């Protein structure tokens, strides 16, 4: 064993943290960063600096390095790759020993990987593109409270995606009128309705009143339709204590599902709530409010695929993923990539979808992908083709904006979905034949016919800001 000696002073990061010969261990946590270095900082030094500042390093040599095994604990930048079509930045791959992170703590992982290093002066911009969580770490995490199959069993819904609706206007309704809208949507044929992400406990809709009126709506709709129904009651609150109080009250009302804003609420609160949901048999819907602040800039922040992985580890049965076809940002290949990362047991590296590493989830349950944001009945064929069955198509204006009212909007959604599922099962090409499928179904559904006429001109044809830049690696 080499004798450790201490030499005070500052040395290049590459001397300690650049290790191109390193072969990552199966137990390492691997990260891919997109780095835009400051002028005059070369790639190897910038990559090594990121590895250092996100693991054991600081700006100068310290004598306490001698008190531990730095060679074991340090992060290592082990590979650099070009970003296709952009010579101002590059990809740096960093390996971290698993012992750097607390077991089952997404909070601790993010504190290191996206902590102070993102303010480091040596880099002009920094983005965490992907993380490989080793199976050894996955097994320490709580994961989804129930998962896809258990939810299907609880809700008695099989062979198709589920349908939801976010109640609008998102703010301003009284609890009584809110409950009325919930009832009409569920009675019309939807499986779920939803609180908008910013519905918490405002003066006009105190949370307890909302819960009571919603519970009455759900129980009435279930009795009249013979179907299991649910509403995502948002329990996000100013403090964990209040969050759990709201969750407990939802359970007392026999509500099947609650909701949390996982980014604004925080990973600590989310992990705790997911554990509570598993213990108490309550499903957990997750909204991603604030995500675009973090993930939309293609050069700085955290890619959504990383946030999706983190949510699966922290815990949630549903997660909003974008729609590809609606009003929100979402590249098709990238979206299908992170949808697979939410649902599948193993997802291989796939440059064409922006997936930088193999990801093995072991037996961790999957998460329903929620397609929400500017969708209507004309989108149904594409939604089913893109997302498949293990998804929730979450309408808002596409239900509540129907000329004949909420129940008619829900009926139109249900008829459109069932027509597309039947056509898919017959082997028809949904995206090529979608118009014919819907117009034929509308012959027996006046609600769908009016919906198709109402939204026939509505499109959201804006270019994607965060495009895949990984083509061939």
From Swiss-Prot:
The basic functional RuBisCO is composed of a large chain homodimer in a 'head-to-tail' conformation. In form I RuBisCO this homodimer is arranged in a barrel-like tetramer with the small subunits forming a tetrameric 'cap' on each end of the 'barrel'. InterPro entries: RuBisCO (IPR033966), RuBisCo_large_chain_AS (IPR020878), RuBisCO_lsu_C (IPR000685), RuBisCO_lsu_C_sf (IPR036376), RuBisCO_lsu_fd_N (IPR017443), RuBisCO_lsu_N_sf (IPR036422), RuBisCO_lsuI (IPR020888). Binds 1 Mg(2+) ion per subunit. GO terms for molecular function: magnesium ion binding; monooxygenase activity; ribulose-bisphosphate carboxylase activity. Its cofactor is Mg(2+). The keyword rRNA-binding does not apply. This is Ribulose bisphosphate carboxylase large chain 1. The active site is at residues 168, 287. HAMAP family: RuBisCO_L_type1. Substrate binds at residues 116, 166, 170, 288, 320, 372. Belongs to the RuBisCO large chain family. Type I subfamily. One of its GO terms (biological process) is reductive pentose-phosphate cycle. RuBisCO catalyzes two reactions: the carboxylation of D-ribulose 1,5-bisphosphate, the primary event in carbon dioxide fixation, as well as the oxidative fragmentation of the pentose substrate. Both reactions occur simultaneously and in competition at the same active site. The record marks 327 as: Transition state stabilizer. The modification N6-carboxylysine is found at residue 194. Keywords: Calvin cycle, Carbon dioxide fixation, Lyase, Magnesium, Metal-binding, Monooxygenase, Oxidoreductase. Its EC number is 4.1.1.39. Heterohexadecamer of 8 large chains and 8 small chains. Mg(2+) binds at residues 194, 196-197. It comes from the Bacteria. It catalyses: 2 (2R)-3-phosphoglycerate + 2 H(+) = D-ribulose 1,5-bisphosphate + CO2 + H2O; D-ribulose 1,5-bisphosphate + O2 = 2-phosphoglycolate + (2R)-3-phosphoglycerate + 2 H(+).
């Amino acid at each position: 064993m080499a004798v450790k000696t201490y030499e005070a002073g500052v040395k290049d990061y590459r001397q300690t943290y650049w290790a191109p010969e390193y072969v990552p261990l199966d137990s390492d946590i691997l990260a891919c960063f997109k780095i835009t270095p400051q002028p005059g900082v070369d790639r190897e030094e910038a990559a090594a600096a990121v590895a250092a500042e996100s693991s054991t390093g600081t700006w100068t040599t310290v004598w306490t390095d001698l008190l531990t095994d730095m060679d074991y604990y340090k992060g290592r930048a082990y590979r650099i790759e070009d970003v296709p079509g952009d010579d101002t930045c590059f990809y740096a791959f960093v390996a971290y020993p698993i012992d750097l992170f607390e077991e089952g703590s997404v909070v601790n992982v993010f504190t290191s990987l996206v902590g102070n290093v993102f303010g480091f002066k040596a880099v002009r911009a920094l983005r965490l593109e992907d993380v490989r969580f080793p199976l050894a770490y996955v097994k320490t995490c709580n994961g989804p409270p129930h998962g896809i199959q258990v939810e299907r069993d609880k809700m008695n819904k099989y062979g198709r995606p589920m349908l939801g609706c976010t109640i609008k206007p998102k703010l301003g309704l009284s609890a009584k009128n809110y409950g009325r809208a919930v009832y009409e949507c569920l009675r019309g044929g939807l499986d779920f309705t939803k609180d908008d992400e910013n519905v918490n406990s405002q003066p006009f809709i105190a949370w307890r009143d909302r819960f009571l009126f919603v519970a009455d709506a759900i129980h009435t709709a279930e009795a009249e339709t013979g179907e299991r129904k649910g509403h995502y009651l948002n329990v996000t609150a100013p403090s964990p204590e209040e969050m759990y109080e709201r969750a407990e009250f939802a359970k007392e009302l026999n509500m099947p599902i609650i909701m949390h804003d996982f980014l604004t609420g925080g990973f600590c609160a989310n992990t705790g709530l997911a554990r509570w949901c598993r213990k108490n048999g309550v499903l957990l819907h997750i909204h991603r409010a604030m995500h675009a602040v973090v993930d939309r800039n293609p050069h700085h922040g955290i890619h959504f695929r990383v946030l999706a992985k983190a949510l699966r580890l922290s815990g949630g049965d549903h997660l909003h993923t974008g729609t590809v076809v609606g009003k929100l940002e979402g590249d098709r290949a990238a979206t299908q990539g992170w949808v697979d990362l939410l649902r599948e047991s193993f997802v291989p590296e796939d440059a064409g979808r922006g997936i930088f590493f193999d990801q093995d989830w072991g037996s961790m349950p999957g998460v329903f992908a929620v397609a929400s944001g500017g969708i209507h009945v004309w989108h149904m064929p594409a939604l089913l083709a893109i997302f498949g069955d293990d998804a929730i198509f979450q309408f808002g204006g596409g239900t509540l904006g129907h000329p004949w009212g909420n129940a008619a909007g829900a009926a139109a959604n249900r008829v459109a979905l069932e027509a597309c599922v039947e056509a898919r099962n017959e082997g028809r090409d949904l995206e090529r034949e979608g118009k014919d499928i819907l117009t034929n179904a509308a012959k027996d559904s006046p609600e769908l016919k009016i919906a198709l006429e109402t939204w026939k001109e509505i499109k959201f044809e804006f270019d994607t800001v965060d495009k895949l830049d990984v083509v061939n690696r």
